[in-house]
Regions:
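Nucleotide-activated chemistry modules centered on ATP-dependent adenylation/adenylyltransferase
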Residues: 1-208
Length: 208
C-alpha cells in the first residue's frame, strides 16, 4: 500500500513550535517547481533553497534555471526572506553516476540514481550547515514518483542524522498552483526534466 506523504507532512507541521521556526534546506530543481512549495513551507520553516542539479544539461540551461530560481526568490512574498545556496556546476558527476543507464526510460533506473545523487548532497549540506530538516521540491511534479523520492530521503536521513521532510506537493492541487504562480511571475518553464537523455526528440533529432 502506498504511503500518504501529504498526511505525514500535515502531522509533522502540526507539531512544530510556532514561536521558533526550524531551519529547512530545500533542494530545488527550478523556480516553477519551487514556487508553490515556498509559498506553502515558509509559513512553517526558515527556508534555504539548495540549487544542486548536476543533471541539468547543457550548462547554459543550468544557468538559465538558476537565474529564474533567483528571480522567484526575489519576487515571491514570504513571511521572512528565503536564502539561496547555489552549488557550482558539476555535470560530469551526473554523467559518471548514470553511465550505463543512458537508454533507460524516463522515470526508470537512471532517474532513481539522479534522485539519490541530488538528495544525498542535500543531506550532506544540511548536516554540514546545521539544518533541522532537508527536503525537495521534486514531489510537486506529476512526473516524479513521490514514493521513491521519500524512500530515498528517509534512508539518507538515517545515514546523515538529519530529519527528512516527507512530502507529496502535487497533492491539494500543488502542481496547479505552481503553474499559476509561474504565470504570475513570468517564470521560464522548461520543456524537459534536465538531462539530455530526457530532452524531447523531433524527427529522430534531439532539440537544440
Amino acid at each position: 500500500m502506498k504511503e500518504n506523504y501529504q498526511k505525514q507532512l500535515d502531522a509533522l507541521l502540526s507539531t512544530l513550535p510556532p514561536e521558533e521556526k526550524p531551519r529547512l534546506l530545500l533542494q530545488s530543481c527550478c523556480g516553477p517547481c519551487s514556487s508553490y512549495v515556498l509559498e506553502y513551507l515558509t509559513r512553517y520553516f526558515r527556508v534555504t533553497v539548495l540549487y544542486y542539479n548536476p543533471n541539468i544539461q547543457p550548462r547554459a540551461e543550468y544557468n538559465r534555471r538558476l537565474y529564474w530560481q533567483q528571480e522567484l526568490i526575489r519576487r515571491l512574498p514570504t513571511p521572512e526572506p528565503v536564502a539561496l545556496l547555489a552549488c557550482d556546476y558539476d555535470g560530469q558527476r551526473y554523467i559518471d553516476a548514470v553511465r550505463g543507464l543512458e537508454r533507460e526510460p524516463e522515470g526508470g533506473a537512471r532517474c532513481t540514481v539522479c534522485f539519490r545523487l541530488r538528495l544525498e548532497e542535500t543531506a550532506r549540506q544540511a548536516r554540514a550547515h546545521g539544518f533541522d530538516y532537508f527536503g525537495t521540491t521534486l514531489t510537486v511534479s506529476p512526473h516524479k514518483d513521490a514514493q521513491r523520492l521519500n524512500a530515498i530521503g528517509a534512508e539518507l536521513a538515517q545515514q546523515y542524522g538529519v530529519r527528512w521532510l516527507p512530502s507529496d506537493f502535487k497533492k491539494r492541487e500543488g502542481y496547479k498552483r505552481s503553474i499559476e504562480l509561474s504565470k504570475q511571475y513570468g517564470l521560464y518553464r522548461q520543456e524537459y526534466c534536465g538531462c539530455l537523455y530526457s530532452k524531447p526528440v523531433d524527427n529522430g533529432r534531439t532539440e537544440e
